[in-house]
Each structure stands twice: as structure tokens, then as C-alpha cells.
Amino acid sequence: MSMPNPKKTAVRVQKVRLYPDSEMKQVLDELCDYRRYCWNEALALWNDMHEQSLILDDRKSRPSEYKVRNELVAEKQDWQYALSARVLQLSVSDLNKAFRNFFDNAQTDWGKPKFKSKKAPRQGFKTDRARIVNGKLLLDRPHESRHKKK
């Protein structure tokens, strides 16, 4: 008889169907576009860092989640401050997970992470700061947001 693993934790997920108005649809589209932009920039940077580490044969210059994220934050442009910083952080974290799965020998069916296209039928973003209050979705809002509450 095997004992249950005490380190297992339950993950609470809430799947919600949204019916956004035109303003909220624009905000969601901007967040999806920003996530795709962050993923593609992080992937390009990751590939460059990986090539440099192979050429220089230097283990210290290998890409990591923190190196890539810090580089992207240092190169942030003005328009990016109007959007949630968590989108950038979570997209780099997801890219790190994708590369870990790619290099994991136990998961042979995982392919190398690819650039995301705007033409893809499924667009999305992730946040860990959203709340539902009285049937309304509240997203985290950056300090310099263009979409202020009325």
C-alpha cells in the first residue's frame, strides 16, 4: 500500500467565459498582442544567448529566465509601461518552461519553442492578478495606463 505524497498541492483554476464590450475587447487584444511581442522578443534573445554560449563555450553566458527577463526589462520602451508588467514576466516564465520541457529527455514529444504569429487562430495572455468581483473581471492596471476608470 503506497502512501500519498504530502508535497502534492492542488492548483485552483477558474475558467470563465467573457462577454467583453468594445473597450474591454480592445484592452484584451492589446494584452494578447503584448504577450506575443514579449514571447517573440524573449525567444530571439534566448536563441542569441544560446548561440553565444555555444560559440564561446562559456557556461556562464547560457540563457536563463532571469537573464532574459532582466534584459527585456532593461530594454523596455515607453509604450510598454502602459501595459501590465506581469504579462512580460509570465511570458518569459512560460518560455523558460517550454525550453526545460524541450531539453527534458523524459518528454520526447516536446518540440523547440517557436515564434508566435498574429495569424494564429488562438490568441491569449496570462495573468495571476485578475479578480472577479460582482460578475465583472478586474485586471491589474499599470500606473501609467491609458485605460483609466471613468
What are the residue ranges of the model-derived segments?
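Nucleic-acid substrate recognition interfaces
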Residues: 1-150
